[in-house]
């Protein structure tokens, strides 16, 4: 997955440069600065050791995005991801009551001070993890989903491998500093995008202030962008001595979904400034474009030797793609269909393609498929058609 991100990033950077959005030249050194040969369209002043900006699996900007370093509580993105996957699989439920173990109650760092044996609704445990970054609650989630911290950490690393997080290894579900517990900005972006695919996640990650225990325990989101950045949908902060100040911030405007990750900032204020700069750049530079083929360009294709004279092409539905802002009307479409087909034609069989380009660069290719089956004409069918022709009442005008 990481390699696919780099490939798409290179194509998109070329589009941005070709679009002439910026009037200055890109130095050769800057063009080769990012991992995998990606050319950032600009060089931003990001107060972090490592950062990345993505939309889906498209990289829009990156600096040192593959350096492994401690991720602190951004780790909890994976903890939440496995929790929501277990919820959707029906293995656990939001309204179930869970109990805090002695071990979970012993976690250091940020917590809501769960007592051993204290019971709470799973939804509240998720809330405290997502909003307050509570380590005791993160451990309760791990034990609820997998039975033990060890089993949960194994699931974390297995899921990371499945997602293509090539430079990540987890040692715990909390993000507390531990030998070998590392990730990268790119890998954090990957799991952030995956988490945001799940319904209900942003119901928690967008909470600014709330409370638990009948109002006795106040919660304030550690991610200040939730309150102060327009369109912010989350996601997770992290701070330890080893990691410094980290943040994975997500935001949506005008259909464009962005995730910005910064790692290793010196202060909390710097991590917010880093992600704000990345998000501002993304929203100012790119837009979401949904490719669609006009019906008038989907002309029926003649079919020889078939039970129908032609078959209508159908275009697959496309998700949004990222293009330079303000260039949507410049996207060109080329539809390729055959002059004819020979029966049989299967429903869903690929018979052509629609290619969307911008300034000569392909931004999306959609397969065109047969909308319905066209069976091969046989003697019995042909005889039946002849009979219909001879027995049809004459038309009088």
Question: Which residues does each predicted region cover?
Answer:
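Structural motif marking the loop-to-transmembrane transition
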Residues: 5-9, 71, 122, 379, ...
């Amino acid at each position: 997955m990481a390699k696919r991100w780099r490939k798409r990033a290179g194509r998109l950077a070329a589009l941005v440069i070709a679009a002439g959005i910026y009037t200055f030249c890109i130095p050769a050194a800057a063009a080769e600065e990012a991992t995998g040969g990606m050319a950032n369209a600009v060089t931003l002043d990001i107060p972090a050791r490592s950062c990345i900006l993505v939309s889906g699996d498209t990289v829009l900007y990156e600096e040192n995005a593959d350096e492994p370093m401690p991720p602190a509580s951004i780790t909890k993105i994976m903890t939440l991801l496995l929790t929501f996957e277990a919820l959707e699989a029906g293995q656990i439920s939001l309204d179930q009551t869970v109990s805090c173990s002695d071990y979970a109650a012993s976690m250091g760092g940020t917590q809501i001070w769960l007592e051993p044996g204290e019971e709470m609704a799973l939804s509240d445990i998720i809330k405290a993890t997502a909003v307050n970054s509570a380590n005791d609650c993160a451990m309760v989630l791990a034990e609820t989903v997998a039975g033990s911290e060890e089993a949960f950490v194994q699931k974390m690393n297995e899921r990371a491998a499945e997602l293509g997080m090539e430079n990540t290894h987890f040692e715990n579900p909390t993000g507390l500093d531990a030998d070998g517990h590392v990730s990268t900005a790119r890998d954090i972006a990957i799991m952030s995008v995956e988490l945001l695919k799940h319904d209900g996640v942003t119901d928690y990650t967008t909470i600014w202030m709330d409370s638990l225990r009948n109002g006795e325990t106040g919660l304030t989101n550690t991610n200040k962008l939730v309150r102060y950045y327009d369109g912010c949908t989350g996601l997770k902060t992290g701070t330890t001595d080893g990691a410094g100040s980290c943040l994975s911030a997500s935001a949506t405007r005008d259909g464009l979904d962005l995730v910005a990750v910064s790692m290793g900032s010196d202060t909390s204020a710097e991590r917010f400034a880093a992600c704000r700069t990345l998000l501002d750049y993304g929203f100012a530079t790119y837009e979401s474009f949904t490719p669609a083929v006009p019906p008038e360009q989907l002309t029926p294709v003649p079919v020889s030797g078939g039970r129908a004279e032609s078959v209508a092409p159908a275009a697959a539905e496309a998700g949004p793609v990222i293009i330079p802002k303000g260039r949507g009307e410049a996207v060109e479409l080329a539809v390729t269909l055959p002059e004819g087909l020979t029966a049989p034609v299967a429903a869903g069989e690929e018979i052509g393609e629609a290619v969307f380009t911008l300034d000569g660069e392909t931004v999306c290719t959609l397969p065109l498929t047969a909308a319905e089956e066209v069976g091969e004409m046989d003697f019995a069918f042909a005889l039946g058609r002849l009979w219909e022709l001879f027995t049809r009442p004459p038309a009088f005008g």
